[in-house]
Amino acid sequence: MTAEPTVAARPQQIDALRTLIRLGSLHTPMVVRTAATLRLVDHILAGARTVKALAARTDTRPEALLRLIRHLVAIGLLEEDAPGEFVPTEVGELLADDHPAAQRAWHDLTQAVARADISFTRLPDAIRTGRPTYESIYGKPFYEDLAGRPDLRASFDSLLACDQDVAFDAPAAAYDWTNVRHVLDVGGGKGGFAAAIARRAPHVSATVLEMAGTVDTARSYLKDEGLSDRVDVVEGDFFEPLPRKADAIILSFVLLNWPDHDAVRILTRCAEALEPGGRILIHERDDLHENSFNEQFTELDLRMLVFLGGALRTREKWDGLAASAGLVVEEVRQLPSPTIPYDLSLLVLAPAATGA
């Protein structure tokens, strides 16, 4: 039996209990996501500051909306500026649609990522089986679901591109393109990374390899950017031989979607398509050590498990994957972001025979 706590020990146990309840809460994350989905902060900033006005704007029941708003005040996202009138706090302002941090879309339950986060409700299944849970909720694997839902596909591409600096500009600036003639961006989305390279290095041409559902979006984006003469888009499958050789092959937020054996298959295809002296550039999150318990790293790692069966990799894991594909990690460059609370990395891989 556990001994009865002393009077002196009880406050510490109460604090521990409060911490556990906060960490285990499902209602607070759903309240925040509901506020994002309803665009409450945008409506407030547009002048709808009362429950009645907000209910009219959001097509919700005033009495139910008030209960939501009361919790938003309790957790510090809203405050009562005058009796019955609410305004966002500094934290709440992050849920404005035009905020540079772009958090409203990430928390909107109708958008691709927040919708997929519902997969976490079946996390025990993923831990028992090592397999994703997304399909058990939505009936199709993640990318197959996106392919059949153009709205979700557009949402996903937009979310990945929402931080222009960390998504494209920072990695494009981190590499010397002097000796690169052609870049192949494998799984390159709408072409933002390839476009950033093309703008920075006018002598470089590029090819974006993507699935059918994204090809038209990428072509339209590159045309609007005035780069369609230098960056072409090809429909294809990166498990098959790649459509052409290149001096630099980019994998930006691709391998984290796949378990190790599939990641090795993708890397092997990329290695086959390298021109002599070429390099593979992997743009993702990595962690220095196996025993690093970084909250953002572990959270995204679990998200990849329940969405796709993929994983984030530590430095040791990257070395192992590279070796399995006949490659070596030549260098790693950290890419700090001004708008997200963690750094990303650009890993440079070379054929093992030439790598350092």
UniProtKB/Swiss-Prot annotation:
Its EC number is 2.1.1.292. It comes from the Bacteria. Gene3D superfamilies: 1.10.287.1350, Vaccinia Virus protein VP39, Winged helix-like DNA-binding domain superfamily/Winged helix DNA-binding domain. It catalyses: carminomycin + S-adenosyl-L-methionine = daunorubicin + S-adenosyl-L-homocysteine + H(+). It is an enzyme of class 2 (transferase). GO terms for molecular function: methyltransferase activity; O-methyltransferase activity; protein dimerization activity. Keywords: Antibiotic biosynthesis, Methyltransferase, S-adenosyl-L-methionine, Transferase. This is Carminomycin 4-O-methyltransferase DnrK. It comes from Streptomyces peucetius. The lineage of its organism: Bacteria, Bacillati, Actinomycetota, Actinomycetes, Kitasatosporales.
